[in-house]
């Protein structure tokens, strides 16, 4: 709107200024200042009426919105963190105490077997630590099923002692063959 007014005023000053006038049509006199002001007022009121008709559109164009807080259909929809995306139905169905616990990230090495529903004194957490399952590296698993014959506690301890004495360094798979060949040649 301001730009249109500036253009209109600039054109009026050019047309009224001496030397800037074009040849007038025959039968037309020079417009008086009152006529020019009346023309200007009518044009401005016409522009205001057009702006009121397109008022919603101009407000939408003028007001920039944050991409995560766009207003659609009167309600505000917010984007969520990709790791915490839950549908509205899921959030409403869950209990409030579980919502706070489920939304928290956990250490990758520990998986909750059951949710802890309330915070406890730090000294009492050790009792609950037994309910947490510690993840082990797949190559380092000793016994997955303790009912097997080789998985009694005594044999596991003996195996650990044997491993600790002969610590082997992991090597590139292609180099292992060369070392095995060297060992067989030395014998």
UniProtKB/Swiss-Prot annotation:
- The residue range of the signal peptide is 1-22
Q: Which Pfam families match?
A: TRH
UniProt modified residues of type Proline amide: 67, 82, 108, 122, 138, 173
Enumerate the InterPro entries for this protein. TRH
Q: Which GO terms describe its biological process?
A: eating behavior; histamine metabolic process; hormone-mediated signaling pathway; negative regulation of glutamate secretion; positive regulation of gamma-aminobutyric acid secretion; positive regulation of insulin secretion
Which parts of the sequence carry Pyrrolidone carboxylic acid? 65, 80, 106, 120, 136, 171
Tell where it localizes: Secreted
What residue spans carry the Basic residues bias annotation? 105-122
Record keywords: Amidation, Cleavage on pair of basic residues, Hormone, Pyrrolidone carboxylic acid, Repeat, Secreted, Signal
Q: Where is the composition biased (Basic and acidic residues)?
A: 60-76, 164-178
Enumerate the residue ranges of region (Disordered): 49-148, 164-187
GO terms for cellular component: extracellular region; secretory granule
- What is its biological role? Functions as a regulator of the biosynthesis of TSH in the anterior pituitary gland and as a neurotransmitter/ neuromodulator in the central and peripheral nervous systems.
Record-stated family:
Belongs to the TRH family.
Annotated protein name in UniProt: Pro-thyrotropin-releasing hormone
Gene it is expressed from: trh
